[in-house]
Structures are given as structure tokens and as C-alpha cells.
């Protein structure tokens, strides 16, 4: 019996919607990254994007444990000397609630062209509304 290898044009992708209200950031991000990669499917192939589409709503209600709300820092750099910026989890959550989950999931996916294709299948929205009703996403309990 030969080892099965998925082909990119044969992959069946599902749409799922996840409610992030009162979920822990890291645990949610790990499961989302697993499903974006396609590791939950029996036809998973490392060099093919076999993952599903994930729509996440209510990301402004995400939480972190312990004192990470004040201690966790997000850094970015302008490219100029001394141009480093830092924000805490709370500051980033208040200003750009979607970015917190996007950054967490992106760090858990492979780097390179395949990882970039996987992160494009993640749709993150604050609030309970999303524009993907036409895809009829299934509710995914995490």
C-alpha cells in the first residue's frame, strides 16, 4: 500500500466559526493553528495546505491568565535607530483587538509561502457579526 499524499486541487475545505468570548488566548490560538494547517484531517500532508477556513468572532472578549494582561509585551520597530515601540496586551486589545489573536496564531504556523497561505484563511472580527454567512460556516466549539 502506498502512502497517501494530498494534492492541492483535491483538498476539501470547510468553513468554521469560533466564538472567542471568555476563551484563553494561547489555547484558542493553538487549536486554530492546528485546524488552519490541516493536522486534524487524516489526509494531512506537510507540504500541502490542507487546512480549513476559520472565522473568529468576539475577539475583544479574549482573556489571558495570570498577570499577562499587564506583563505581556508586543514589540515593533520603525527601522530607525531608537524606533522601538512596545505595547502591553491590554493596550493592544483595546486598540486593535483582532491583532492579538492574529499574532498569536501566526507565530504558531510555519514560516514561508505555505504559512502565509494558511494565515490568509483566518478571518478575525470583533463583535458577533461577520460577513461570511454565505459560506454557511459550522459552529466549532473549542
UniProtKB/Swiss-Prot annotation:
One of its GO terms (molecular function) is mRNA binding. The keyword Ribosomal protein applies. It holds the Pfam family Ribosomal_L13. InterPro entries: Ribosomal_uL13 (IPR005822), Ribosomal_uL13_bac-type (IPR005823), Ribosomal_uL13_sf (IPR036899). One of its GO terms (biological process) is negative regulation of translation. Keywords: Ribonucleoprotein, Ribosomal protein. Gene3D superfamilies: Ribosomal protein L13. GO terms for cellular component: cytosolic large ribosomal subunit. Transmembrane segments: none annotated. This protein is one of the early assembly proteins of the 50S ribosomal subunit, although it is not seen to bind rRNA by itself. It is important during the early stages of 50S assembly. Part of the 50S ribosomal subunit. NCBIfam families: rplM_bact. PANTHER family: LARGE RIBOSOMAL SUBUNIT PROTEIN UL13M, RIBOSOMAL PROTEIN L13. HAMAP family: Ribosomal_uL13 (MF_01366). Belongs to the universal ribosomal protein uL13 family. This is Large ribosomal subunit protein uL13. It comes from Chromobacterium violaceum (strain ATCC 12472 / DSM 30191 / JCM 1249 / CCUG 213 / NBRC 12614 / NCIMB 9131 / NCTC 9757 / MK). The lineage of its organism: Bacteria, Pseudomonadati, Pseudomonadota, Betaproteobacteria, Neisseriales. The gene is rplM.
Amino acid at each position: 500500500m502506498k502512502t497517501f499524499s494530498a494534492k492541492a486541487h483535491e483538498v476539501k475545505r470547510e468553513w468554521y466559526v469560533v466564538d472567542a468570548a471568555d476563551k484563553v488566548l494561547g489555547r484558542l490560538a493553538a487549536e486554530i493553528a492546528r485546524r488552519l494547517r490541516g493536522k486534524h484531517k487524516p489526509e494531512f500532508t506537510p507540504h500541502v495546505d490542507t487546512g480549513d477556513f476559520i472565522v473568529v468572532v468576539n475577539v475583544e472578549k479574549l482573556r489571558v491568565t495570570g498577570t499577562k494582561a499587564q506583563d505581556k509585551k508586543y514589540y515593533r520597530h520603525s527601522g530607525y535607530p531608537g524606533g522601538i515601540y512596545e505595547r502591553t496586551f491590554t493596550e493592544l486589545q483595546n486598540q486593535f483587538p483582532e491583532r492579538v489573536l492574529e499574532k498569536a496564531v501566526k507565530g504558531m504556523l510555519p514560516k514561508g509561502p505555505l504559512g502565509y497561505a494558511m494565515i490568509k484563511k483566518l478571518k478575525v472580527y470583533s463583535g458577533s457579526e461577520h460577513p461570511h454567512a454565505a459560506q454557511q460556516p459550522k459552529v466549532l466549539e473549542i
